[in-house]
């Protein structure tokens, strides 16, 4: 499996980090990103990992997001400047930051065996959560780690609405018999990034039929990110003087 196409939360600053304890002010979660390096010439940059101050199985590092994310993978790495790393851990997660659940019912996930090798663990099924936590279970030397969480890209709904799509007076649907249609090109106010879905509804109908059966329809055709064709149609003996419609277009971007 590959992390290609996934979003790195820590590397892209898309989450907040909190820890159970920190060894001191320069051994905090700020040093926990994968491949973090200090400058090697002073102690200001601190350790090349998050390091807990207490060494027991109650320690954790948690990543919290402003909106729920779909977590696909977690990556773990040891401390770059000392022989300290986490050899096994469990994952806990929450959708509301109140009720927490354990991945694989709290079973241990294999960690790392040296300072710098990155070990990815892809979840059995995607985890939908707002917050997710690593709880070290066993370790070498000290609880120290660098990590990353990979998620699906966040998609937001973008909507545009439009009105007054009009066939014109005494349109082509007002003569003849059988299936007839009038096509009205529609241009969106701005271009979508992805192909939208378009829904149409009538707001004016002016038609008649000798059998008292109104047969009309409207549908989108040739949808692009820039616009679509609005197709008004009728069939049989219906006489349609004019039709008017509105649209709503929505895309996930």
From Swiss-Prot:
Q: What keywords tag this UniProt record?
A: Acetylation, Cell adhesion, Cytoplasm, Lectin
The record ties this protein, via CDD domains, to: FA58C
Q: Tissue specificity, please?
A: Stalk cells.
Record PROSITE patterns: FA58C_1 (PS01285), FA58C_3 (PS50022)
The protein's location, in the record's own words, is: Cytoplasm
UniProt motif Cell attachment site: location: 79-81
Q: Tell me where on the tree of life, at the top rank, the source sits.
A: Eukaryota
Keyword set includes Cytoplasm: yes
- Signal peptide (from-to): none
Query: A Gene Ontology biological process annotation?
Result: regulation of gene expression
Q: Which residues carry this modification: N-acetylserine?
A: 2
Is Cytoplasm one of the keywords?
Answer: yes
Write out the GO cellular component annotations: cell cortex; cell surface; cytoplasm; cytosol; extracellular matrix; intracellular vesicle; phagocytic vesicle; protein complex involved in cell adhesion
Q: What is its main location?
A: cytoplasm
Q: Could you cite one Gene Ontology molecular function of this protein? A: N-acetylgalactosamine binding
Check the record and name the Gene3D superfamilies matching this protein: 2.60.40.2080, Galactose-binding domain-like
Q: Where is the F5/8 type C domain?
A: 2-152
Extract the PANTHER family matched here. Answer: DISCOIDIN-1 SUBUNIT A-RELATED, DISCOIDIN-1 SUBUNIT A-RELATED-RELATED
Question: Whom does it interact with, and what assembly results?
Answer: Tetramer of four different chains (A to D).
Q: Relate the protein's function as given in its record.
A: Galactose- and N-acetylgalactosamine-binding lectin. May play a role in cell-substratum adhesion rather than in cell-cell adhesion. May be necessary for the maintenance of normal elongate morphology during aggregation.
Protein name stated in the entry: Discoidin-1 subunit A
What gene name is given for the protein in this entry?
A: dscA-1
